[in-house]
Amino acid sequence: MKKQCGQQPEIMYRKGDMEMGKQTAWEEIDKKSSEIFTASDEIWGCAETAFTEDKSMKILCDVLKAEGFTVETGLADVKTAFKGTFGSGKPVIGILGEFDALSGLDQEAGATEKIVVHDGASGHGCGHNMLGTASLSAAIRNQKISGRKRKTGNRDLFWLPG
């Protein structure tokens, strides 16, 4: 049957299943929060600018590998672009993460106003350390939920430098 504009989509889950899924998702995130925060702080400390994020990439890849993801580095001939994959088949779910620092944005961590630590040094003033690890958190949560429900599908998580 062809769908018509304004027609309600098919419901994939009953409401109770959805609520249980949300609760399970938060539980999975909570279990990994310390590890995710540590990775974010470590990436903050590296503050590597575009296409030089070797240490930051290793931090993220190590967590992905420990969680059972297959990791492929050097995507599109960019040495610090990488992908973590879990599962196979369809649908393919993609999540994008960034993790580069910006030149001249060095500042003290946790401050509510800019406090320069090293004048002119690179830093994560735009929060890409958190964007990268938030994507990591979403990937792990998705993997854990999918595994419990035995859902098929491929989860491709892309982290792009620069």
Explain the meaning of each model-derived region.
Residues 1-19:
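Short, Lys/Arg-enriched N-terminal segments with co-localized hydrophobic residues
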Residues 152-162:
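Divalent metal-dependent hydrolysis catalytic cores, especially in the metallo-beta-lactamase
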Residues 21-124, 133-154:
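Acidic/His- and Gly-rich active-site-bordering loop/insert found
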